[in-house]
Amino acid sequence: MKTVTFKIILGIMAFVIICSAKSSTRDPLALYAELDKNATPNTLTSKEKEKGWQLLFDGKKSDGWHGYNLKGFPDCWTIEDESFTMVTTGGQESQDIITNSVYRNFAFSVDYKLTKGANSGIIFQIAEDPKYKFPYETGPEFQVIDHTNWPDKLEDVQTNGANYAMYPPMAKPYKPLGEWNHLFLVVDGNYVTQILNDVIVVRYEKNSEEWKKLKDSGKWVNFPDWGKFDEGHISLQNHGTKVWYRNIKLKVL
């Protein structure tokens, strides 16, 4: 009787663990499908509002954003054609802007448009602290770049759509220069999914053995706090080249 009872308890525990594992992650494509691609940029539809989506930029004001380690909004950014864009600085890294709020589990959506040779990125799980000069010292990056016209030779993990210096894109669904691309990022616990123009380009599990091996054998070995934080700000990177960002939306999971 004790043996039977013990087996039943083990079975219940296994069932609970399996169910917990399944419920801990959401379907990124289902979240992606909640957005209306035909909606007017920088607005939320009633359906999106019902699903819990927030608008992080209305195309007119910089409310909700500030310069990294600054109190206000930096002069090297401006709003042009209802989009955030940079005042170019000759290709040199400059002041990134970050969300005022911090996020742990979320879905993030933004449209971006590249100029020739442009370089930028969406960096997340950022710690804001004067001891760091740039957001990329702590946060992973969804790479945004015109790698075709970038002057230096790049590795696959540095190309458009990559999880920068970690995971190369599995597909290359890029739009031509001057056209809007749609970037979608889901961070759900340790599970990260990057979608570009309707196609999943990167999926990985943070803190997995594979992730740790990549982190400890590449660029980030010299950045001890990179990937350390599970909650943080989201950044639009300013690499001194011109990129437009609009239609920025977020859903807390």
Predicted regions and their residues:
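Bacterial Sec-dependent N-terminal signal peptides
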Residues: 1-25
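Carbohydrate-interacting regions of secretory-pathway proteins
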Residues: 22-253
